Regions:
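Divalent metal-coordination and catalytic microenvironments
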Residues: 24, 63, 79, 108, ...
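Conserved hydrophobic/aromatic beta-strand scaffold that supports enzyme active sites
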Residues: 62-64, 193, 357
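Acidic/His- and Gly-rich active-site-bordering loop/insert found
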Residues: 2-104, 109-117, 121-130
Length: 417
């Protein structure tokens, strides 16, 4: 398959990708609000012979491409792209930059453009493949709700059962380089909201209060010791306090304090140990300060660990190596998290063991090489979720499109494709 995938891509008219990408980039929409974005995707899909189903779980879309007799044992492959943006003010200075206070600061505009490119390739080259390919455009990835929303809206019953689940994401790195690995690739994530219920009083009479601010401060300090003292050094865990708030007046001891903790792990047993330790610390600090009310502990925005299938990796990675050569490299584990894995997990153990998630570098190569030579990669290269994050379009969209086609054709490509 790999020997001619570039020829297949190059024979397909993808000249529309630049204008499409510029349009999405200049009109970013937040999680759950992707109405205009979804409309542009549906309009582009209208050019292809596919079954399109929209408004799944909000603004989710699937396009089902079938080639051959569905009764045959040909493979069914699902490839997903996320489509939502972030509440980030863009500072790239690009002439197509967003001006609405939101931004495609995580590259979802690139993901959608590349997946539509794959759709064009499938439609224009039906003599080169056989099977079923599902292009899934997912809303609300950034808040962790989109995949579950599509599943809750009946996704499994509305599409053919996939044999393989694929996704990709752009990251800082030399534009056009593809990074892949087997095993744990993205961390699992939990957000934990903790509310300490104290007793309010006048600021001049702290002895009549149960001060939740003090308790919350002690909790934050104690949380810092969990990873260093309870998680083995050979394991990975992060527990970061992202929110700490209490009170609104200088002379009132408040009745409540709120803490939000974000946790990341690569292993389910470590996750359970970390979460249990957090709950233990919260309750113990409340007890130590005489808090009589049970603290409120709420888990939300859970993202499962992204664990790449060894079998799928073994089939797709040789295609990447053949097409990209030295530009196909080993990925490292990332501490970021994703909700994509909820989709294969909805199909049980078979789905859980049949997914692959890879990365594509998007930084201008000269910028990356200069920063590497100066030893300033972590300080000077714009990263995802930054207002300065701007992919180098041409090499990035080409690599994303070719990587998508290579991975899909590894399963549905016919002899000589």
């Amino acid at each position: 398959v790999s020997t001619s995938i570039e020829a297949i891509v190059d024979s397909t008219d993808l000249s529309w990708q630049w204008d499409f990408y510029r349009g999405l980039h200049g009109h970013p929409e937040l999680s759950g609000q992707e109405e205009w974005t979804a409309a542009q995707i549906v309009a582009q899909l209208a050019a292809y012979d596919a079954t399109v189903i929209d408004h799944i779980g909000g603004h989710g879309i699937v396009a089902i491409f079938t080639n051959g007799d569905p009764k045959d044992s040909d493979a069914t492959v699902l490839l997903r792209a996320d489509i939502d943006a972030l509440p980030v003010v863009e500072t790239t200075g690009a002439d197509y930059a967003s001006k609405n206070g939101n931004m495609h600061a995580c590259g979802h505009d690139m993901h959608a453009t590349a997946l539509l490119g794959l759709c064009a390739i499938l439609d224009a080259n039906r003599d080169k493949w056989r099977g079923t390919v599902i292009a899934l455009f997912q809303p609300a990835e950034e808040n962790g709700s989109g995949a579950l929303a599509m599943l809750d809206d009946g996704l499994v019953g509305r599409i053919p059962r996939p044999d393989v689940f694929l996704a990709q994401h752009i990251i800082p790195g030399p534009a056009g380089t593809v990074f892949s690995k087997e095993g744990p690739t993205l961390a699992g994530s939990d957000s934990i909201e903790i509310i300490v219920h104290g007793r309010s009083a006048h600021g001049s009479m702290p002895h009549t209060a149960i001060d939740p601010t003090y308790v919350a401060a002690m909790i934050v300090v104690r949380l810092q010791g969990i990873v260093g003292r309870e998680i083995p050094p050979s394991e990975f865990a992060v527990a970061s306090v992202g929110t700490l708030e209490a009170g609104h007046s200088n002379n009132i001891i408040p009745g409540e304090a709120r803490i939000v903790v974000n946790c990341r792990t690569y292993d389910e047993s470590v996750r359970e140990r970390l979460n249990a330790a957090i709950e233990r610390v919260v309750r113990a600090e409340c007890a130590a300060s005489g808090v009589t009310a049970e603290p409120t502990i709420r888990y939300f925005a859970h993202a499962p660990i992204t664990n790449n299938s060894a079998e799928v990796f073994a089939r797709v990675r040789p295609e990447f190596d053949s097409v990209f050569g030295a530009g196909s490299q080993d990925a490292r584990e990332w501490t970021a998290s994703e909700d994509f894995t909820n989709i294969p997990r909805a199909y049980g153990d078979a789905g859980r063991d049949s997914s692959l998630y890879w990365f594509v570098g998007c930084t201008p190569v000269d910028q990356w090489e200069a920063a590497a030579a100066a030893g300033t990669l972590e300080r000077t290269i714009p990263v995802n979720h930054s207002g300065e994050f701007l992919p180098d379009f041409s090499p990035t969209v080409r690599a994303c499109t070719i990587a998508a086609a290579s991975a899909v054709f590894a399963y549905v490509g016919t002899e000589g494709s």
